[in-house]
Amino acid sequence: MIIWIASYPKSGNTWMRALLSTYLYLENDKFDFKLLSKIPNFTRDKYFENIADLNLLKSEPLKISEYWNAAQSRINLQGEEKIFKTHSACVSLKDKWFTTETHTSGYIHIVRDPRSVVCSLAAHSNTTIEKSVKDLLNDNFIGSNGKYNLAELTCSWKINYLSWKKKKKFPGILIKYEDLFDNTEKEFKKTLVFLQDKLNFELNDKKINQAIKLCNFSELSNQEDKRGFVEQVNGKFFRKGKKDSWKEELSTNLKNQIEKSLKKEMQELGYLN
């Protein structure tokens, strides 16, 4: 069965993957980005090989919805719990759901202040913040579809957030990036408690502290500078690691646009009073 780490892009998904892969799979005392391959992106080409025509899925990205079920069924043939990353909203397209309780045993849903998301996403994609805001509010936004990944039906930040929040057919937890930033140990332990029965491991404070130390932002940023990072696109992936970076980068007009469009959800999450 699949356990998802689900989020809108640039919300802390990779940081959580780093923490979890270090805790679960580290064999020495040094973090390596290769560990992240233990928690892969679901839309990697290899999970759809021999199921679909990959060239067709590259040219007609929304057709991937026809193969979500088959790809997840094949993954689950291994008969073990497996963690996957996704930026897909948990929605249906032409009556094809991204995932169901047949394939999924749970999810870790990570959210981040959308004002910070657009700043980080613009730098990561080497585009303007205006373009990132447009994408953030686009209900039909399609992400990824790169060299090694197929398309992800990311949708707007609002749809992405609500789609996982409202999914009641399998258990999940919500982790706010800002809480993970402020109290990494507490939020990481919350995540491990959620996972421990599914993955059959014991909590180990020494390993928790080691994972937090090896995966703090400065360490990950230094690793990226020294060795590079395969998920780096245009700009630096681990850029600032701040909680409220939007206060330094976002114009008043764009700030107001986001807050007006997402007022209810941002208030619900404590991003607006």
Task: Annotate the PLM regions.
Residues 1-175, 232, 240-244, 248-273:
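PAPS-dependent sulfotransferase catalytic domain
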Residues 29-30, 196-210, 220, 273:
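Short, surface-exposed acidic
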Residues 34, 135, 202, 209, ...:
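Residue-level signal for alpha-helical context at structural boundaries
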Residues 85, 189, 195, 202, ...:
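Compositionally biased, low-structure terminal segments
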Residues 93-95, 184-187, 219:
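Short, solvent-exposed polar/charged micro-motifs at secondary-structure junctions
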